[in-house]
């Protein structure tokens, strides 16, 4: 009988220890507060559960100086304002699972004794970077949103969250873009200038290669007429006309009797032969003798 009683006592002791361990592992599980929460009131409990109430956190401190566990899960929170946690000096565990957190205030990250239970998300990157400064920091974990299984936060951030573009990266990108634009515009400007110079040099070279016959001669204002009259008295000089006169053969009056078109071709030309009166640029009248019949050949 004594041995049976001893076994029963040991069994009861083991069950009691198991219950104590289970209660300790639940992190002071407490009752959920009603949906309407007055943030101005004072909360004296050590465990505050505001889970699933669809709350938004105010920018003023929560009056709960004795709280050790704070459950804010399933509220659709995106930001944890640092001012809300200013007076929670005894807070040890903060539960924010099932919230789409974009960022966590740096004041919470600097509290090295605070345990944060949150879903794995890229919003924890800044919090993780600051927590690396805590001495004796254990491995930081996050919970899978679906299975709530713990995962290594460092591994999750490296695999799932690419490094964000900080001010230095953005500045370098802007500077590189500006440099590229300046280089492209400079190249286009240099190409246009080189093209203009090449055209100018080609034009000068083509001018230099032109023969004297290709160069157009200037047209004088005065162009004399040809006539078949004998030289007469010199006409008075008159200013040159601005209009260009056409060349033409002008025959005035009847040809002289001794100026026969059928004269012998080999006879020497005399003073009475037909001639043309040519007036040069200097207005000098000069006779030009010719045999018109031979000229017609």
Swiss-Prot record:
**UniProt record, GO biological process:** canonical NF-kappaB signal transduction; connective tissue replacement involved in inflammatory response wound healing; gene expression; heart development; inflammatory response; response to angiotensin; response to hydrostatic pressure; response to transforming growth factor beta
Topological domain ranges for the Cytoplasmic compartment: 191-297
* Signal peptide range in chain numbering: 1-25
Where is it predominantly found? Answer: membrane
Q: Where are the LRR repeats?
A: 66-89, 90-113
**What positions are modified (Phosphotyrosine)?**
289
Give the modified residues of type Phosphoserine.
Answer: 211, 238, 267
Q: Which GO terms describe its cellular component?
A: cytoplasm; membrane
Q: Which UniProt keywords apply?
A: Cytoplasm, Glycoprotein, Leucine-rich repeat, Membrane, Phosphoprotein, Repeat, Signal, Transmembrane, Transmembrane helix
Query: Does this UniProt record's set of keywords contain Signal?
Result: yes
For this protein, the record's Gene3D superfamilies field holds: Ribonuclease Inhibitor
UniProt topology in membrane:
Single-pass type I membrane protein
Spell out the InterPro entries in the cross-references. Leu-rich_rpt, LRR_dom_sf, LRRC25
The subcellular localization recorded is: Membrane; Cytoplasm
Segments crossing the lipid bilayer: 170-190
Write out the function statement from the record: Plays a role in the inhibition of RLR-mediated type I interferon signaling pathway by targeting RIGI for autophagic degradation. Interacts specifically with ISG15-associated RIGI to promote interaction between RIGI and the autophagic cargo receptor p62/SQSTM1 to mediate RIGI degradation via selective autophagy. Plays also a role in the inhibition of NF-kappa-B signaling pathway and inflammatory response by promoting the degradation of p65/RELA.
Q: What's the subunit arrangement here?
A: Interacts with RIGI. Interacts with SQSTM1. Interacts with p65/RELA; this interaction promotes the degradation of RELA through autophagy.
Name of the featured protein? Leucine-rich repeat-containing protein 25
Native species of this protein?
A: Mus musculus
